[in-house]
């Protein structure tokens, strides 16, 4: 199980996830999902195949965006496969 990504978490290029769910939260922050964008405009293209929020797959620590940058920050206590 891996921590989910939230708005404000960073990737390996130090970009910040700035899009995510407006109504589902982890630790008070919106959850990042497949297709959500970071500050460079790169979309998440890797995500959980089994957990969905707002009909989109949930992104986790280690998942990558269109530039190939992996999420390096996330929730330490909200975990998914």
Locate each region found by the language model:
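Intrinsically disordered, low-complexity proline/glycine-rich segments
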Residues: 1-81
